Every structure is written in C-alpha cells, then in structure tokens.
Design a protein with these regions (language model features):
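Alpha-helix boundary/capping residues
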Residues: 9, 25, 96, 115-118
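Short, basic, helix/turn surface patches
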Residues: 20-23, 84-92, 127-137
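Short charge-dense sequence patches
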Residues: 1-2, 35-46, 61-64, 102-105, ...
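An accessory alpha-helical subdomain
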Residues: 104-237
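Short secondary-structure transition/capping segments
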Residues: 6-8, 69-70, 112-116
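Rossmann-fold dinucleotide-binding core
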Residues: 40-103, 109
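Rossmann-fold NAD(P) dinucleotide-binding segment
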Residues: 1-48
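A general structural signal for well-ordered alpha-helical segments in protein cores
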Residues: 6, 18, 86, 180, ...
C-alpha cells in the first residue's frame, strides 16, 4: 500500500534476495518505473518484466558507498521496457555528472564475469594462498615496491568487507563456473611453460597479450604511474 502512488521503485537488496523482493511488487502503478541496482542483470530484469507491466530498467552503479557524488561515475543501464518513460531518470543521473553506459542484460553479465567475478575470485584465491603459505604480511608490506604494495592493498581491502557480498557475486551466475575453469586451465597452461623452461612460449604469449591490449597498455601504464604517486602520498605505514 505504501507504493500505490510511487513514480519510481528501486530494488536495492542483496543479490540472493532480489528475485524474492521483486516478486512482491505486483501492485505498482502502471506508470511507475521499476528498477534494480544489483550486479547481475538477466535474472532481475526477467523478474521485473514478469511482475510489472510498466517501465522497467536495470541499473548497475559501478562505484561503491564511499563515493560521495556521481561526477565521472559510470552507471550501466539495461533496458527492460518503455525507455521513453524512464528517460528522465537517466537524464537526471547525467545532470548529476554520471556517465550512462547502455548494454543488453546478457552483455552486462558476460562483462561482469570478467570485470568483477574473475577479479574477485582471483583476489580471494591470492589472499587465501598468502594465508595458507604462512606469509608474514608485515614483512611483505615493508618489502613491497609501490606497485606491489598497491596490489596488497587491493587484496587486503576486499577482506575488510562483507564476505556475503562477494560470495553472492561469484555464486550468482552458474555460467561463472565455466569462466573460472577456463581461467584455471590457462593458469596451468602457463605454469607448464615455466615447469619445462619454455621461455620462448612464455614470451610469445606475453607479446600476444600486449598486442591485444594495444594502446590501452600504454594508457594504463601512465594511469598507474599517477595512481602510484598518489598512493605513496597517502601511505601511513
């Protein structure tokens, strides 16, 4: 009843609860915009389209709660229904400084499997490996160059957050399993080159990846230099 006059309803709950919550939204006004902000899109969009006959859009803000404004922040959008009805919402995000990046739900979930799932899974595996190897974290910090310190920061910050959040992201899509298996296969493939001492194969692979990155490799190198300078200024230990 509290939503009977709503113009916009945004579902912002943990991934594992999203579908259940959406299924309760059966009495929204026809003109109400129904949206979600979860990090997977195909399943929520399907549920929203099924429960609500009005305008539907999937949103994925590519930033966390520490961000204080929308300037230069990316919001991915996935059309569900009636984009002309929710156009004003996206325009308002633009007014606040956000960059709107529209894709289909399948494109979104495929990209997130690489951008989020693989990155989180690799980071968790690396942290788990450091722990099981009995690494001295204080010593690693003291002996790290700026770039490796930054990598340790990225690992450590993940383990300072809610494990359920990352578990939900990794476990949300069964297709992620195949992606992680392919990653493990390529890891072992490169390990085999190291084991047999095939440096030529390793260098060939390296150059192939460098060619694939193209101009982005140099762009990322320069961006990382600026980030490292900033990180060094903020260093507390």
């Amino acid at each position: 009843s509290i939503l009977c006059d709503a113009d916009l309803v945004i579902v912002a709950v943990p991934i594992r609860l999203t579908s259940m919550v959406i299924r309760q939204l059966k009495q929204l006004p026809q003109s109400c915009i129904l949206a979600d902000v979860t990090s997977v899109k195909e399943s929520p969009l399907y549920e929203m389209l099924k429960v609500h006959p009005g305008p539907v859009v999937g949103l994925h803000p590519m930033f966390g709660p520490d961000v204080t404004g929308l300037v230069k922040q990316t919001i991915i959008t996935c059309d569900g229904r009636a984009p002309d009805k929710y156009h004003w919402l996206l325009e308002q995000f633009r007014v606040w400084g956000a960059k709107i990046y529209p894709v289909t739900a399948p494109e979104h979930d495929q990209a997130m499997a690489m951008v989020q799932v693989m990155r989180h899974f690799s980071t968790i595996a690396y942290g788990y490996h450091l722990m099981t190897e009995g690494a001295d974290i204080s010593q690693l910090v003291e002996m790290s160059s700026p770039i490796y310190r930054l990598e340790l920061i990225m690992v450590g910050r993940l383990f300072a957050q809610d494990p359920i959040l990352y578990t939900d992201i990794i476990f949300a899509n069964p297709d992620n399993i195949a992606m992680m298996k392919r990653f493990a296969y390529r890891f072992l493939e490169l390990l085999e080159d190291v084991e047999i001492g095939d440096k030529d194969a390793f260098v060939t692979m390296f150059n192939q990846v460098a060619d694939w990155f193209g101009d982005y490799a140099e762009v990322f190198l320069q961006e990382s230099k600026a980030m490292l300078l900033k990180a060094n200024e903020l260093k507390k230990h």
